[in-house]
Swiss-Prot record:
GO MF term (any one): zinc ion binding
Name of the featured protein: Zinc finger CCCH-type with G patch domain-containing protein
Provenance organism: Drosophila yakuba
Protein's UniProt keywords contain DNA-binding: yes
PANTHER family: ZINC FINGER CCCH-TYPE WITH G PATCH DOMAIN-CONTAINING PROTEIN
Biased composition (Acidic residues): 252-261, 271-283
One Gene Ontology cellular component annotation held by this UniProt entry: nucleus
Length: 513
């Protein structure tokens, strides 16, 4: 049939190129014959095809059935093998997860704003099998969060004791969150050395929830930190927390510091010795700056380290300063040592340690019961009381100065009253004092009289200068009267002393021969 079609094609090409009319007639007749022959050949082929079609259809059905049976056999074998592999994989996972029960980890928790990781404790393995994000079978772990920030994360205390009457869906507290095992991360322990001012932290409040806040100051000696809590619902926003009640949060600065430390380590390995020394200098400066900052935000102790050196030359502090110590920071290379000096204690002589402990327990466990400083302060208090008693005794003694002040000087006395008081002075009382004491008192009173006269002259000048101001004139008149009274008293006292001195001189002349 293909040969006939090829011949027909050749005849058609020759017919197009033929120029003679007789030749064209012959080619047309040949073309018609070939077309009829092709038509007959096609009809014969269709009849033969219809006769063989049922037999070929049966062969195809059989072949299709065999193919389906082979595919089903292969699928059955593959599914059984896959099931065995999955069961083996799940068994290995359960064995691995069962060994992790009781360990600490970091587990995800779905919040309204997204997923956040919190420290948790693995308490069991769930029986249900889940498919993780990569399409691999995985088991779920039941975890209890150690730092719950929301009520749905707070573990049920009755569930932990096995006495909760509600199931997981009805209880208001958590019976353990179910998380895929593949999402578990490494436990993030709290690093209290990172505590510094403005550091974000989680703080434990009485409601057993951890609330967010920021550090105000840190006391590494007492391990106490003052935190300002976020939010307006806290009556006392600033509170003191112990270190075990805090969880420092990681910031971007910490990640940058870690990256910079890694880069500095790699650069120190690659660079020359000169660059390594410069890096070490930078690290030393950063360390000193860190220690200074640490000293600024540390609770100030009651006593300064080295306060006893005010009685010495302070050679100890000078040596420590040369060795790199920064005043105000703790001892040690990182400045996190003690700040308060260690108090010396003296135990009773000839007593055993058990007897000393009994004495301390009898004093309600006072740690400073045998402290040397406490004994010194007690001795100082006794000495202070003795000094006060001596002062009272000395103040009760009457000397010439006290006698003159009490007897002669007095507020509101006029010149005439001063004269009367001076006349009433007993001669025997003045005779009790020595001539030297009387001379000193005479000089002192003379100075007081001259000073008082100068004050009166100044007040008189003020009166003359401010004659038009009535109120000021009144105040100046009062001052003038007061100065006159004091001057009269001093003059009376001076006359009394002069009289006593003159009497003594007269007696001395009487005894001279």
């Amino acid at each position: 049939m293909e040969e006939y079609e090829a011949q027909l094609l050749v005849v058609e090409q020759a017919l197009e190129n033929a120029a003679d009319e007789a030749q064209r007639q012959d080619l047309l007749a040949l073309k018609n014959n070939l077309q009829e022959l092709l038509a007959l050949t096609r009809d014969t082929g269709d009849e033969a095809h219809t006769d063989e079609l049922p037999q070929q259809g049966d062969d195809l059905d059989d072949e299709l059935q065999r193919l389906k049976s082979e595919l089903s056999d292969l699928e059955a074998v593959g599914s059984s093998q896959t099931a065995l592999d999955e069961e083996r994989q799940l068994a290995d996972l359960r064995t691995k997860y069962t060994a992790m029960v009781g360990e600490k980890c970091s587990a995800p928790h779905e919040h309204s704003w997204g997923t956040c990781y919190h420290n948790a404790l693995i308490c069991g393995v769930d029986d249900e099998v889940v498919m993780n994000s990569e399409g691999v079978l995985d088991a779920r772990l039941r975890v209890l969060f150690t730092n719950p920030t929301h009520r749905e994360m707070l573990p049920c205390s009755y569930y932990l004791e096995g006495e909760c009457r509600f199931d997981e869906t009805k209880c208001r507290f958590s019976h353990g969150a179910l998380v895929p095992g593949s999402s578990i991360r490494k436990y993030n322990p709290p690093d209290f050395h990172k505590l510094s001012r403005s550091r974000p932290v989680f703080a434990l409040l009485p409601d057993r929830l951890w609330h967010r806040g920021r550090v105000l100051c840190v006391n590494f000696v007492e391990q106490v930190c003052r935190v300002r809590l976020d939010g307006q619902d806290h009556k006392e926003r600033e509170r003191d927390f112990k270190f075990e009640e805090l969880f420092p949060l990681t910031t971007d600065q910490d990640e940058d510091d870690e990256l910079s430390s890694e880069e500095s380590n790699s650069s120190m390995n690659d660079d020359s010795s000169d660059e390594a020394e410069s890096d070490m200098d930078d690290l030393e400066e950063a360390r000193r700056a860190r220690m200074v900052e640490l000293s600024l935000f540390t609770f100030k102790p009651t006593e300064r380290l080295g306060a006893w050196e005010e009685f010495t030359r302070g050679i100890g502090s000078k040596l420590m300063e040369k060795m790199g110590y920064i005043h105000g920071t703790g001892l040690g290379s990182d400045g996190r040592g003690i700040v308060t000096p260690v108090s010396a204690q003296i135990l009773p002589q000839g007593r055993s340690l058990d007897a000393c402990m009994e004495l301390r327990e009898a004093a309600n466990g006072d740690k400073d019961y045998f402290s040397v400083e406490r004994k010194l302060k007690r001795a100082q208090r006794r000495q202070r009381k003795a000094d006060e008693k001596a002062y009272v005794r000395e103040s009760q003694r009457v000397d010439v100065f006290t006698f003159l002040n009490d007897s002669v000087l007095g507020p509101g006395e006029s010149s005439q009253q001063g004269e009367q008081v001076a006349k009433k002075i007993k001669t025997n009382e003045l005779q009790q004092h020595s001539t030297k004491t009387l001379n000193v008192e005479t000089v002192r009173i003379a100075d007081e009289i001259r000073r008082k006269q100068r004050d009166m002259a100044k007040v008189k000048q003020s009166l003359d200068r401010n004659s038009g101001d009535a109120q000021l004139q009144k105040r100046l008149q009062v001052q003038m009267e007061s100065h006159k009274q004091e001057l009269a008293t001093l003059q009376a006292q001076e006359r009394s002393l002069s009289k006593e001195q003159q009497t003594r001189k007269s007696k001395n002349k009487m005894f001279e021969f």
